[in-house]
Amino acid sequence: LQRSKTAREAIKVMTTIANTYGYNSEGETFTICDPNEAWIMEMMGKGPGSKGVVWVALRIPDNAVCAHANQSRIGKFNMKDKKNVMYAKDVVSFARSKGWYQGKDADFSWKMAYAKPDFSGRRFCDARAWALLNHFYDMSPYLDWALGKDPNAKDMPLWVVPNKKVSVADVVACMRDHYEGTPLSVADGTDIGGGIWQM
């Protein structure tokens, strides 16, 4: 990142280095910011026998709050929006070559092709993103997704426009959240098999 002056440059540097030297990871999500822009990028190594990565990066709107927690969050994205979206040239074709996606480019969802959320991903990871976003936006329509039980539940938005100005104290409160006061709370001693997961 020291080689970059902007978030856009950092994305190009990171993906160029990973494509040149390889990247041994099942997938990572990065928040990359500069004084003017914030981006969320997801990147995955191509696996044994292949060097390089597939990746996608989306610019988070200036008026929005975004959250991610150990689970792929980027779904569908507008491949024509060059101002706010960057991606590997083979982001769709690589998924097709592996048999992970067969549809049209316009319907492609990164996370459904490369890291489809299962119960654990939703209940223990997306739930933490849900809790953070719930501080700034009514996330109740997406509770079933965060609970992880219904495979057809309404997916969460990647970001939300907050219902108030976000302060440093608000962010601190988010990081201390344990789902108190929500159906995700385990404060009553409910054993969900994983204990209390903190952000």
Where does each model-flagged region fall?
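Short acidic, glycine/serine/threonine-rich loops at helix termini
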Residues: 42-45
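C-terminus-biased signal that marks the final domain/tail of proteins
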Residues: 9-15, 22, 26-28, 34-38, ...
